[in-house]
Amino acid sequence: MSRLVVVSNRIAAIEGKKESAGGLAVGIMDSLKDQGGLWFGWNGKISEEDEPLEKNQQDNITFAAFSLKQSEYDQYYLNFSNTVIWPAFHYRLDLVQYQREDYDGYCRVNEMLAGRLKPLVNEDDILWIHDYHLLPFAAACRKLGMKNRIGFFLHIPFPTSEIFNALPPRKELLEKLCEYDLVGFQAESDRQAFIENLALVTTVEDLDDDRIKAYNKLVTARVYPIGVEPESIRELAEGPLPPKLAHLRDKMNGQLIISVDRLDYSKGLPERFQAYETLLENYPQHRGNIRYFQIAPTSRGDVQAYQDIRHELETEAGRINGHFSTLEWTPLFYLNQHYERSLLMKIFRHCEVGLVTPLRDGMNLVAKEYVASQNPNDPGVLILSHFAGAANELTSALLVNPYDRDGVASALDKALSMPLSERKARYQEMIAVIKQNDIVHWCQSFLDDLKKIPSKAEIVGQAVSGATR
């Protein structure tokens, strides 16, 4: 029986509580348990030695983790993945720092990883590769003669040609992507951008059932919006707040606004702070009656752009609080630290407004988690950016343009004063979508489609059989 082989930049924690794991890790773990398999990824360690893979077995799942050398980490992860692909795919060409040697290192690491994975893979195994760190991974596998079914899911947006054309290795990246059998995207706009970019550099034949032919390769390009575990989130949210937080919530009269993001320039945090400032300026009735909590733990702190955004937010938070605070009231709480996911779900449930306004986002699961954590009898209101993939599904949120500070301020005012009947109606429409398109559905849909695609070995076998008749 074929196994599922998952490859991602970081491997999931082998020992960990389900309530602290993200939805993606839980969904993939469940899929691995169903059919047995292997999870292959980086262990987060830097080592100059050629260390063997760290292997661990948990029931019918094997975890195989590799370390990286400093030069590999720098070129593959820090430089090309996170200072070229990440900013470009989030429409920030001004932050791209491209060097050919970094791209070469990126491809070299993908080839090295494919070489280390190959001995662990059986001929009939199905490979599921995740995210932008591994765009060329299938090409590296094919180079080694691997004919397995290989699927790829891009968790971040795929940019339009005006952006993608600025990347020097764009043709190479597109050709390498066509070595996958199935390429999955968060939204139809991402899928269309992929095909549009392909059509600019090679002949693309549009076939049936979302299949295309490019570079003499058949690839299926399809949309799979990622979901969450609504029932698990509800259970976490319904639990009591820790005593200190419960006491703090009791002391805080008025309404709470919550945002939770990684500290990243794609999340629109400075623009969000400015919109909140506009709310306090233009709607003075809310002063003293609301508090805004922005939780933004540091990520990629060794990249200069992330250091810059942290400094900017600290400055903005201090300026806004300095202008509006009183002895009894502080309007904005900026928390640059990590909180357990289980605690965040409880916090979401006690906040009247969820403010999720990225400038560009593949999906944004925080939006779905906020809705799933709400009390159906007294739900909060979600304010969501048009530019998040989640906006395609959560159409009953208050949808906003994150660049329009007046528009976001107006949406905040509307959310803070929305009657219960409207809050309930919007919540019911959104939670129905979230339950229908949950993480299990996402995993199952992708893997079912991948299994239906003939492997390269089957295609070769059919061709040989036909030629001998």
Swiss-Prot record:
The record marks 86, 156 as: Involved in alpha anomer selectivity. D-glucose 6-phosphate binds at residues 10, 77, 131, 300. GO terms for biological process: trehalose biosynthetic process. CDD domains: GT20_TPS. Pathway: Glycan biosynthesis; trehalose biosynthesis. One of its GO terms (molecular function) is alpha,alpha-trehalose-phosphate synthase (UDP-forming) activity. Keywords: Glycosyltransferase, Transferase. Its EC number is 2.4.1.15. UDP-alpha-D-glucose binds at residues 22-23, 262, 267, 365-369. It catalyses: D-glucose 6-phosphate + UDP-alpha-D-glucose = alpha,alpha-trehalose 6-phosphate + UDP + H(+). Belongs to the glycosyltransferase 20 family. Probably involved in the osmoprotection via the biosynthesis of trehalose. Catalyzes the transfer of glucose from UDP-alpha-D-glucose (UDP-Glc) to D-glucose 6-phosphate (Glc-6-P) to form trehalose-6-phosphate. Acts with retention of the anomeric configuration of the UDP-sugar donor. PANTHER family: BCDNA.GH08860, TREHALOSE-6-PHOSPHATE SYNTHASE. Homotetramer. This is Trehalose-6-phosphate synthase. It comes from Sodalis glossinidius (strain morsitans). The lineage of its organism: Bacteria, Pseudomonadati, Pseudomonadota, Gammaproteobacteria, Enterobacterales.
